[in-house]
């Protein structure tokens, strides 16, 4: 474990692990504590070109001023438990991916719960993907990527496209994905003490805020429970001490059982959300370079 990762684990545990009771308090706490500091957003904007889009979808284009090319596109879906986060807050990831891959990144602002329950955010995600296609982007040149809740939504989007017989992207990248809302995995209990950010009860509370009364077994909410045949190649990254470890491991196993292609990399001694640590955490740089390399070799340009 690097010094930076060790420090990050301690900071996350102190700052965000203990959450207040009640849904309204949880939402306020998450949106305040998970907000990317303004100085870090500014820092990552250096050397990048940012173009804000407000309609017909909301989000931002991110490209590297020095390494951009016009063909490949990464469609990025931010994390935040479906109740927080934004295209701006995930800029540490999107700018780094743009720099390492040379692709343009479109980060979507989708509607958040509990103001907008499932499937509002997923509907926005599908609309954003179709908007990319309507602008002449070849689906085979698109990588869909996301972290945490965004990783689960990445899979849900691919499942929705497959069922509708719409063009699939060239590949998927799932960073610490949340794929199962039924709270049935062993790692939820076994890693509750070790995970720097979450305990099992947190996952239950975020699921309730997102779904309301909707079934947690809906495969578009819990894509781990879906038929995973016919999906694009997938890269999965997760930390060994995360409560979401089994969400990632079981996804990898189920994709292979369905005849698909999946690469799983389990990182040691990193907190959930370590992908936001660029450029200060060495493990973050390693993970995002791996993701960029995976994307470069699997999208058609």
PLM features per residue range, with description:
Residues 50-301:
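Alpha/beta-hydrolase superfamily serine-hydrolase fold, recognizing
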